[in-house]
Every structure is written in C-alpha cells, then in structure tokens.
C-alpha cells in the first residue's frame, strides 16, 4: 500500500508537467509540418533553386533528420513499455551525435560565408558594413618589373620553372595534430564553471580528503606490514653504480627504463614536500578558484652566440 501511495504521488506531481510538454510538442509538430509542406510545394514549383546547394548543409540536415527519427522511435518504444537494450537505434544515435560534434568546428568556420551567401541571395548585394568592402585591391599587387626584365628572367630561369612545376602537383599531406575538444562556442562563464568542476574533482581525489574519509569512516582500517624488496634492490644497484663511477672515473649511461624507475621513486618522495599544503581543497571550501587550466608560460632561454675560437697552426 505504501509503494502504491508513493507511486500515485509521483504521478500526480509529474502529470501536469507531462501534459504541458505534450501540448507544446503537439503545437510545434503542427507548426513544423505546415512549414515543411509550404517549402515542399515551393520546391516542386521551382520557386527555389536547390541544384547548387552546399553539400555540407545537406549532410548536416540529413543527419539531424535521422537523429530526430531515431529519437521518435525510442520515445514510442518507451511509451509502449518495451526494453531498449541492444537496440540498433541507440547505436545510430551515438554515431550521428559523434559526427555532428566533429562537424561543429567546420560549421563555425563556414558560418560567415554561408550568412554572406544567404544575405546576398535575399537582398542582391552586400551590406555596407561587410568586411569584404575593405579588402585589398588585387590590381595594386601587379609586379612593377618591365617586360624586358621579365623576358630575361624567363630566359635564365626557364629550367628552374620547369623543375618547379612538378612540385606544384604534389599531393598535400595535412600536418598531424593531436585531437582536442572543441570549445569555441563556450562563453567565459561556461569555461569558469568547467574549471571549478575540474578543481572539485581534483580536490576529492586529494590525499587530504582521502585521509579524512578514512579517519571518519566506520569501515575497518586495513594495515599492511610488508617490505619493499624492489626498492631495496634499486637502492643497492644505485649504490653499486655510484661506487663504480667514482672508482673508475667514468660516467655510465642510463637506459630509458632506469630513468623511468628513478622518476617514479622521486615522485613518491616528492609528496613529503606537499604534506602541509591545503590549497588543493579550496574548491570545496568556497575559496578562490585558481586558474589551473591556463598555466603561466615558461620563459624561453635565449642562448647568446659568442665568438668562435680559432686555433692557429704552429709554424
């Protein structure tokens, strides 16, 4: 009886919101349907020229249409009470969403060109404040060389031009750039919010919070008493290496694995210097958020070129 009462309370609380959303959805569907029918009618009457469109926009709108179809299909399945496990529509939605996210930087770059073309098609001319009105004149970039100098250059550098022509048809290889998350359309407030969330997650993983959690937890404490033979072996190897270098007056080269092991040992010992540092939990206490996403750039060392020493031969 208690579960039934709780279920009825949830239904009574969510029912007005669901009815309002369904009514809004119905109105939007009617508006979109009428608008699409008018567009289809004008296209069939050849009022709009669709032969010279942008393939990028065609792909984007087709993906959005497929996305809406799959979402509608999933909503219908949920209303009928069917299971969505291993449904192919979910995999299609993930694929389409990934492609749309990858297209966002291209859409941001093409936005100005698309808006300019649409404005030109509607008004027939560019606006007065269009940046293209202030573009440089290509006619002023014509070479000032005389025809005689041009002919001389053609005669002398004929072979070089012929040699350079095949390089112009070389295939373009784009540079390999590490993939980064696109955040060009985020505002400064959104970036600040992400930085705060990142600091909160880092603070929850800090050693101070872990120790407080273990201190006030009711779970039994696990005590480990063991001897680290690997650390002892590395210490003996380092001592033998040092004695050998001092006795033989040579410097032994270190391999990559030895450098990684030494760096790991230094990382464990360097934590003692931060044992009294509590600034990493300021995000949880409401303190000032540090700008961890934009570290200060390091100054580059400028190497001054000195005079080279010249050794003269003895006579």
Curated annotation (Swiss-Prot):
Note the coiled coil stretches, chain numbering.
Answer: 181-206
Query: What segments bear the compositional bias annotation Basic and acidic residues?
Result: 159-168, 182-200
Q: Which Pfam families match?
A: Sas10_Utp3 (PF04000)
Q: Say if the entry is tagged with keyword Transferase.
A: no
A Gene Ontology cellular component where this protein is annotated is:
cytoplasm
InterPro entries for this protein: Sas10/Utp3/C1D
Alphabetic keyword roster:
Cell projection, Centromere, Chromosome, Coiled coil, Cytoplasm, Nucleus, Repressor, Translation regulation
Q: Name one GO biological process term.
A: maturation of SSU-rRNA from tricistronic rRNA transcript (SSU-rRNA, 5.8S rRNA, LSU-rRNA)
- Provide the protein's localization: Nucleus; Nucleus, Nucleolus; Chromosome, Centromere; Cytoplasm
Please give the chief subcellular localization of this protein. Answer: nucleus
> Basic residues bias located where?
296-315
Locate the region Disordered: 127-201, 289-315
Asked if the record carries the keyword Ligase, the reply is: no
What PANTHER family does UniProt report for this protein, alphabetically? NEUROGUIDIN, SOMETHING ABOUT SILENCING PROTEIN 10-RELATED
User: What is its quaternary makeup?
Assistant: Part of the small subunit (SSU) processome, composed of more than 70 proteins and the RNA chaperone small nucleolar RNA (snoRNA) U3.
The UniProt entry's sequence similarity note says: Belongs to the SAS10 family.
Function, as annotated:
Part of the small subunit (SSU) processome, first precursor of the small eukaryotic ribosomal subunit. During the assembly of the SSU processome in the nucleolus, many ribosome biogenesis factors, an RNA chaperone and ribosomal proteins associate with the nascent pre-rRNA and work in concert to generate RNA folding, modifications, rearrangements and cleavage as well as targeted degradation of pre-ribosomal RNA by the RNA exosome. Its dissociation from the complex determines the transition from state pre-A1 to state pre-A1*. May inhibit mRNA translation.
The name of this protein is Neuroguidin
State the species of origin.
Danio rerio
Q: What is the lineage of its organism?
A: Eukaryota, Metazoa, Chordata, Craniata, Vertebrata
Question: Gene encoding this polypeptide?
Answer: ngdn
């Amino acid at each position: 009886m208690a579960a039934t009462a709780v279920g009825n309370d949830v239904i009574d609380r969510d029912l007005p919101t669901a009815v309002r959303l369904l009514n809004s959805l119905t109105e939007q569907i009617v508006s979109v349907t009428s608008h699409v029918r008018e567009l289809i009618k004008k296209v069939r009457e050849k009022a709009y020229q669709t032969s010279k469109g942008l393939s990028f926009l065609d792909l984007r709108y087709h993906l959005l249409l497929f996305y809406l179809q799959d979402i509608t299909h999933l909503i219908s399945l949920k209303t009928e009470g069917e299971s969505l496990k291993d449904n192919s529509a979910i995999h299609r939605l993930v694929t389409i969403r990934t492609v749309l996210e990858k297209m966002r930087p291209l859409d941001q770059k093409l936005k100005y060109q698309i808006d300019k073309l649409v404005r030109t098609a509607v008004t027939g001319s560019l606006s007065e404040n269009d940046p293209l009105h202030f573009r440089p004149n290509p006619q002023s970039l014509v070479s000032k060389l005389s025809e005689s100098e041009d002919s001389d250059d053609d005669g002398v550098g004929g072979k070089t031009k012929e040699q350079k022509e095949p390089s112009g048809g070389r295939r373009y290889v784009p540079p390999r750039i590490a993939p980064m998350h696109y955040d060009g359309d985020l505002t400064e407030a959104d970036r600040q919010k992400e930085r705060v969330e990142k600091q909160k997650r880092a603070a929850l993983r800090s050693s101070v919070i872990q120790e407080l959690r273990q201190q006030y937890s009711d779970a039994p404490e696990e005590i480990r008493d063991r001897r680290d033979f690997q650390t002892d072996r590395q210490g003996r190897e380092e001592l033998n290496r040092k004695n050998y270098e001092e006795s033989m007056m040579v410097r032994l080269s270190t391999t990559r694995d030895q450098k990684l092991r030494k760096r790991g040992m230094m990382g464990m010992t360097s934590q003692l210097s931060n044992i009294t540092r509590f600034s990493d939990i300021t995000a949880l206490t409401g303190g000032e958020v540090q700008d961890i996403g934009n570290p200060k750039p390091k100054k580059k060392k400028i190497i001054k070129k000195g005079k080279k020493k010249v050794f003269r031969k003895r006579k």
